[in-house]
UniProtKB/Swiss-Prot annotation:
Family the UniProt entry places it in: Belongs to the small GTPase superfamily. Ras family.
Regulation: Alternates between an inactive form bound to GDP and an active form bound to GTP. Activated by a guanine nucleotide-exchange factor (GEF) and inactivated by a GTPase-activating protein (GAP).
Primary location recorded for the protein, binned into one broad class: membrane
Binding site for GTP: 10-18, 29-35, 59-60, 116-119
GO biological process: signal transduction
Record-given protein name: GTPase KRas
Keyword hit for Lipid biosynthesis: no
Function description: Ras proteins bind GDP/GTP and possess intrinsic GTPase activity. Plays an important role in the regulation of cell proliferation. May play a role in promoting oncogenic events by inducing transcriptional silencing of tumor suppressor genes (TSGs).
Encoding gene, per UniProt annotation: kras
Amino acid sequence: MTEYKLVVVGAGGVGKSALTIQLIQNHFVDEYDPTIEDSYRKQVVIDGETCLLDILDTAGQEEYSAMRDQYMRTGEGFLCVFAINNTKSFEDIHHYREQIKRVKDSEDVPMVLVGNKYDLPTRTVDTKQAQDLARSYGIPFIETSAKTRQGVDDAFYTLVREIRKHKEKMSKEGKKKKKKSKTKCILM
């Protein structure tokens, strides 16, 4: 069974824990209790393949930013979460993405942009803004509501699909490099 290491990042209060707990335990946590770091595991079937999701729910608060490099190193894919009623959390996505790319030392890291709190009427981040940002990053965008469960499975499953595509691409590039290195050298 394939295991996928998923990391949920974003500013404090955007609903990272609520999304994760909704996926794992099928219930909505409405009281806010800032996370330092929580880890969850769940076996799921995605596109006919049984897999184990190892999900790291991270601290959004700035005082825990020193811990970020460590968990970003081990993550294979990242859910970059903002709240649709919090423009600052949307603007912060750029910083999380840059930090992930720096720590992973790669421009090509599996990510999904997630606009959470879709159930709230007080929207300040337009869907089109988020779609445009995701398009500029070359990553999928999904709107979710941890409260109603809308888009929750889709967000995590899409990230697994992005990781699979990334692994396939890396494996093809590895094979191309091996083929190139098999050229013969003739000495005269």
